[in-house]
């Protein structure tokens, strides 16, 4: 049927071309020049006069990349045939000329059929994407109903330390529902003493299943920013990149925070990226374990040799059970589960790239983990203190001086970053740097040692390693996943797949086996599969109160659906499977 339609369309185009360019009787105003009533060589109908400033109307959606070059080539061929035909046209159009134009029209008919198919596929993808984009924007905020609360340290009951890093300490915390609970805790001196406080329901009873400390408060160590709120916000502004709009509505001492055009970007919410619910400056308290764990970071009035200032920045986030490193020390996920965990990191990195942000400090310590009702881990990227989120430069950082910071994690620094040399016009491209780090972390997720950590002969350095030195992954790992991890760790960034294409590869390998099994992968078959996946995902999301990890991943896939990126992922998978 498609061939018949293309032939019919080709005949119509061929007939139209013959009628358009065939010689017409009438006055001639010069050798080889048509009269005023003719319109040879202008692509117009005879007798139609166009205004000098008229512009051709665009024909709907732009032609996909894979057809554009061929269409332009055909257009050039048409121009040559037209010129030759006009020269010979005075003697009449012979059978040969008619055959050439008929063949040319048939070729255009086939191209137009492919173009129409691509337009239908692109339109279907856009409609599916619009549905699931709205659903993925619904990131829960436990403080959403407390519009003007939580902007002071005194609003929280702080428990024990969760952990500490290079620039901050993190504590568990809760906010009593009723004001009298807070007043009672303050009266008893429980603030900062690790009280045994649980969340309460609206009636004052403990909410079933509610954690005792649902929040984590990150207290930044302030050594060089001074004690003014302006200086603190300027120095630590990168920490505010994943903050919600409501998080920045509080008063920072005597200062109300305002985002400047030259400041860092504000990251849109994503299920695989941490969300900061509240941010504020306050005096540094003496929290549990401070004198033992980080005495040098305290102000001198707590520790005489302390280097810290008396005021700093506090960030309120969700309290996650553990980090990825802690989870992998206790658990060994199955190959399918590990593939889904790697996929979650790629989804998060793709969102950062689309927002023009580079994390630059991806490691298993900066990835948090929680579980769904089935015990499947859900990963969240955290700690944006080293991120690149500059509106002026995007992901292309000018590297005109060696004093420009490359990022925070030297071991997992992509080759194009670690080997960059400063100069007047030097630029570091971070568009695929975090994707490379995901490839390295994938070794840990699949139960192997990270090849870029440690010492000895097995240790690799991103500056000098060769791809042949990368250790083989276990045979239990699916072949396409092994191939993808190696492709993510290619030294040349332009040879690596983007985070979006890499995520699509894993999506297809997990849930698109039926589609990949087809001998001839056509767009109409792909669209039918996507519609089926959309219906099944919507149904699964409705049937469960809380979506499981697989459903959430499928929703992310459909929310980021792009026809071209999906086709590239399918072709990449097919080429890997066809290779010996």
UniProtKB/Swiss-Prot annotation:
What is the name listed in the Swiss-Prot or TrEMBL entry for this protein? Serine/threonine-protein kinase PINK1, mitochondrial
Expression is induced as follows: Induced by oxygen and glucose deprivation in neuronal cells.
Q: Where along the chain is the active site annotated?
A: 361 (proton acceptor)
Region spans: Disordered: 28-60
**Gene name per UniProt:** Pink1
Q: What is its EC number?
A: 2.7.11.1
**Location(s) in or outside the cell:** Mitochondrion outer membrane; Mitochondrion inner membrane; Cytoplasm, Cytosol
Question: Where is region (Required for outer membrane localization) located?
Answer: 111-117
The entry describes its oligomerization and partners as: Upon mitochondrial depolarization, it forms a supercomplex with TOM and TIM23 complexes. PINK1-TOM-TIM23 supercomplex formation requires PINK1 interaction with TOMM20 and TOMM70 and is critical for PINK1 stabilization at the outer mitochondrial membrane, kinase activation and downstream mitophagy. Upon mitochondrial depolarization, interacts with TIMM23; the interaction is required for PINK1 accumulation at the outer mitochondrial membrane, kinase activation by autophosphorylation and PRKN recruitement to mitochondria. Interacts with PRKN. Interacts with FBXO7.
Q: What is the lineage of its organism?
A: Eukaryota, Metazoa, Chordata, Craniata, Vertebrata
Kindly give the InterPro entries that the UniProt entry links to this protein.
Answer: Kinase-like_dom_sf, MitoQC_Scaffold_Kinases, PINK1_STKc, Prot_kinase_dom, Ser/Thr_kinase_AS
What residues does the transit peptide encompass? 1-77
Q: Name one GO cellular component term.
A: mitochondrial outer membrane
Classification via PANTHER family:
SERINE/THREONINE PROTEIN KINASE (PTHR22972), SERINE_THREONINE-PROTEIN KINASE PINK1, MITOCHONDRIAL (PTHR22972:SF7)
